[in-house]
């Protein structure tokens, strides 16, 4: 396994107040998205430095005062996010998979998580971080091999609902954990077979 520690470009003081330009939030967000895509395609884990924030800025690079903090509060322990950073690093991803991950990628433009796995149910449960409150306030749909389809409606307090399921699949094995914003899979429907999984925005957003 490969783990990337403390990656990322420092945030300049001006970045919090401007959208365009080399130090603007759009350019900054694009840089982080492209970096996150590389990590996803490589299948590596990563962390972002200074999660708790830093009140003081320093001159790390040419461009003026900057900080590594992902929060912009004036306190040490921040809660006001720099969302042009946090919305990227907190993207959906397969946190724990019982079996082998073949590939995964979150597309920020379409808000689609593509995940290919070869499950092994003898290894326990799987967890996929969705972050619905951030990325899917309009709900999301889960497609497995296109013949097992479920969805989550944030306006209803019923968890994951099933649109269609193949023979032998048990929808009750799929549990939505609202507190952790994770999809917990107790058992995959097709053990030791390659599965093509998609998480897409919207309720019943499928053909």
Where are these regions (language model features)?
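Aromatic-rich peripheral "rim/lid" segments of glycoside hydrolase catalytic domains that contact
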Residues: 14-145, 181-206
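Structural recognition of the beta-strand scaffold that forms the well-ordered cores
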Residues: 1-10, 44-50
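Extracellular/luminal ectodomains and secreted, surface-exposed scaffolds of diverse proteins
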Residues: 101-102, 147-190
């Amino acid at each position: 396994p490969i783990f990337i520690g403390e990656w990322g470009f420092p945030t300049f003081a001006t970045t919090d107040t401007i959208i365009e330009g080399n130090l603007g939030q759009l350019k900054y967000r694009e840089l982080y998205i492209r970096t996150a895509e590389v990590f996803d395609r490589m299948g590596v884990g990563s962390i972002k430095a200074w999660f708790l924030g830093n009140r003081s800025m320093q001159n790390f690079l040419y461009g003026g005062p900057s900080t590594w903090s992902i929060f912009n509060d004036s306190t040490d322990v921040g809660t006001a996010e720099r969302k042009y950073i946090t919305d990227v690093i907190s993207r959906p991803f397969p946190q724990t998979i019982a079996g082998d991950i073949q590939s995964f990628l979150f597309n920020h433009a379409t808000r689609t998580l593509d995940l290919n796995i070869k499950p092994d149910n003898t290894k326990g449960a799987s967890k996929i971080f969705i972050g619905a409150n951030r990325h899917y306030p309009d709900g999301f749909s889960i497609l497995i091999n296109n013949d097992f389809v479920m969805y989550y409606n944030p306006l209803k307090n019923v968890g994951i609902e099933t649109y269609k399921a193949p023979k032998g699949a048990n929808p009750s094995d799929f549990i939505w954990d609202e507190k952790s914003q994770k999809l917990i899979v107790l058992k995959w429907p097709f053990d030791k077979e390659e599965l093509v999984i998609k998480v897409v925005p919207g309720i019943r957003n499928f053909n």
